[in-house]
A protein has these predicted regions:
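Hydrophobic secretory-pathway targeting helix
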Residues: 1-41
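C-terminal capping alpha-helices of c-type cytochrome domains
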Residues: 15, 20-23, 107-133, 209-270
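Detector for the c-type heme attachment site
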Residues: 20-22, 55, 61-67, 76, ...
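Extracytoplasmic low-complexity, Pro/Thr/Ser/Ala/Gly-rich segments
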Residues: 28-73, 78-84, 92
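Intrinsic disorder/low-complexity detector
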Residues: 32, 38, 42-45, 113, ...
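Intrinsically disordered, low-complexity Ser/Thr- and acidic-rich flexible linkers and loops
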Residues: 34-37, 166-178
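Sequence/structural segment immediately N-terminal to covalent heme-attachment motifs in c-type
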Residues: 44-63, 140-165, 171-172
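Extracytoplasmic electron-transfer domains, predominantly the class I c-type cytochrome c fold
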Residues: 76-126, 171-232
């Protein structure tokens, strides 16, 4: 039996050796380059560096010409431009680890210089029609005006305290297209990202151009969203800043609890009398 198996084992060994010879040294498996954006080339000029980063990390989904593929949208139409490109990279929404994955905010995978390089390359190479990166100065924004703009245009989706939440029904798209969409809060977004989102309308968010929200109002709005991150709580404990319903419920529970304890104390005292 052993003699019968010997030629077979020798044949298998020779086949494996031949595969190793033709294949060369076998190293550990590595994911595709577009899943490793942090290891970008940094020695080239801004536009050239942006081209290298784009072709390596973005072209797989958006195409080398920026016209999009079945995995990613066209970058030469709509509000695509410097502001939107900077927004999705600054907030970590791009690049996604898997193309079908829904964009969500996370830590950016690129350094500031790399983001600027990609933005510059996309702008020069594809000439998208979207707006430029807005210039803002939250320190000089009018909080009162910002609160009015926020209440009129933002509070319906992002809540009065800026905590976001689930989008139930979009006024134009209906429930079928908005189910499962979560509106982000402002806690993890800087002022520039908020301004860029206002001007470009990423995802299900509407676009607010200069006619709807002027540059002065935009400056006031981002000043107010920055204030919402750490507002002054004149009434005491914020209770999560989720609104008056929860505050009222807590008030009722605490009030009724104190009242029940008082009634019990009175009843105990009355029972002790001779």
């Amino acid at each position: 039996m052993r003699r019968a198996l010997a030629p077979l084992l020798l044949g298998v060994g020779a086949s494996v050796a031949a595969c190793g010879y033709f294949q060369g040294d076998v190293g550990p498996y590595r994911t595709p380059a577009y899943y490793e954006p942090a290891q970008a080339a940094t020695g080239a000029g801004p536009v050239d560096q942006g081209r290298q980063l784009y072709l390596r990390d973005c072209a797989h989904c958006h195409g080398a010409d920026g016209k999009g593929t079945e995995r990613g949208p066209d970058l030469t139409v709509g509000t695509n431009g410097p502001a939107l490109t900077d927004f999705v990279l600054r907030t970590g929404r791009m690049p996604v680890e898997e193309p079908p994955e829904q964009m969500r905010a996370r830590e950016p995978v690129y350094a500031e210089g790399q983001i600027a390089a990609i933005v510059e390359y996309v702008k020069n190479e594809f000439q998208p029609p979207g707006p430029e990166i807005p210039h803002i100065d939250p320190g000089h924004g009018d909080l009162a005006e910002g609160q009015q703009v926020y209440a009129e245009h933002c509070a319906a989706c992002h809540a009065t305290t800026g905590i976001g939440g689930a989008l139930l029904v979009h006024p134009r798209q209906g429930e079928s297209k908005t189910r499962g969409i979560v509106i982000p809060d402002f806690e993890h977004s800087d002022a520039l990202a908020v301004a860029e989102a206002v001007r470009t309308g990423p995802g299900s968010m509407p676009v607010f151009g200069p006619r709807a929200i002027s540059d002065e109002q935009l400056n006031a709005l981002v000043a107010y969203t920055e204030y919402l991150k750490d507002p002054v709580d004149e009434g005491g404990a914020p209770i999560g800043r989720v609104g008056p319903v929860v505050e009222g419920a807590v008030g009722w529970l605490v009030g009724l609890g104190v009242l029940m304890l008082f009634i019990r104390w009175v009843g105990t005292k009355a029972g002790e009398q001779p």
